[in-house]
Swiss-Prot record:
Family: Belongs to the chalcone isomerase family.
Protein name: Chalcone--flavanone isomerase 1
Note: Part of the biosynthetic pathway for all classes of flavonoids, a large class of secondary plant metabolites, many of which are brightly colored.
Binding site for substrate: T50, S192
Catalytic activity: a chalcone = a flavanone
Function noted in UniProt: Catalyzes the intramolecular cyclization of bicyclic chalcones into tricyclic (S)-flavanones. Responsible for the isomerization of 4,2',4',6'-tetrahydroxychalcone (also termed chalcone) into naringenin.
Keyword Cell cycle listed: no
Length: 235
């Protein structure tokens, strides 16, 4: 039977994403859901900027399987709702963004902030509290530089917090840099990668393929209470 513990590591442009990690400041070990490259067509060439790995808490499999077991990878990768269920599901997510090309913290944080604020204002949900959180988000990045191989690490928790950490040596640090208590930002960070307009289609494809396999081999009995739990969380 396939289980999260049987998830394998992945190599993306010589960036190795291990099969499991323990996020900074956390006691839980999360499994590798999927990984892929983020890039863009520039003057006819596909330029690769980062490799992205998305890790999930073990209980994500029974929770998602209650609704998505039996779907093919192709069906999942084309489902906005499936990725939305990952983003909003009541389990931890850990996103590792590792540089292929160098990037400054200021460049990265300003791009993410502009995207978040734009979406929130368009939906009429932007508040003063959100503005204060964005200021803190920009502050923690402003003096950082990320050479190739350096990583930005995000932990999205079901309680609505976003934990941010940095790694310059390829290792996952034990302590986090900052914890921001803002559910919208916590979800927006991972949604920017795997959501409807996510920046890494390759990561979405990897997630869909690996999770389809894990769910389809998961013990049916273990999913009995999963869908009601998802429903309680608005999924």
């Amino acid at each position: 039977m396939a289980t999260p513990s049987s998830a394998t590591s992945l190599n993306v442009e010589n960036i190795v994403f291990p099969s499991s990690v323990k996020p900074p400041g956390d006691t839980n070990t999360l499994f590798l859901g999927g990984a892929g490259v983020r890039g863009m067509e520039i003057q006819g060439n596909f330029v690769k900027f980062t490799g992205i790995g998305v890790y999930l808490e073990d209980k994500a499999i029974p929770l998602l399987a209650g609704k998505w077991k039996g779907k093919t990878a192709e069906e999942l990768v084309n489902s906005v709702e499936f990725f939305r269920d990952i983003v909003t599901g009541p389990f931890k997510k850990f996103t590792q963004v590792t540089m292929i090309l160098p990037l400054t913290g200021k460049q990265y944080s300003e791009k993410v902030s502009e995207m978040c604020v734009g979406v929130w204002k368009a939906h009429g949900t932007y508040t003063d509290a959100d503005g204060a959180t964005i200021d803190k988000f920009l502050e923690v990045f402003k003096d950082e530089n990320f050479p190739p191989g350096a990583s930005i690490l995000f932990t999205t928790s079901p309680d609505g917090s976003l934990t941010i950490s940095f790694s310059k040596d390829g290792m996952i640090p034990e302590a986090a840099n900052i914890v921001l208590e803002n559910e919208k930002l916590a979800q927006a960070v991972i949604e920017s990668v795997i959501g409807k307009n996510g920046v890494s289609p390759a990561t979405k494809q990897s997630l869909a393929s690996r999770l389809a396999d894990l769910m389809n081999h998961f013990d049916e009995k273990a999913t009995t209470d999963a869908e009601p739990n998802l429903s309680k969380n608005g999924l």
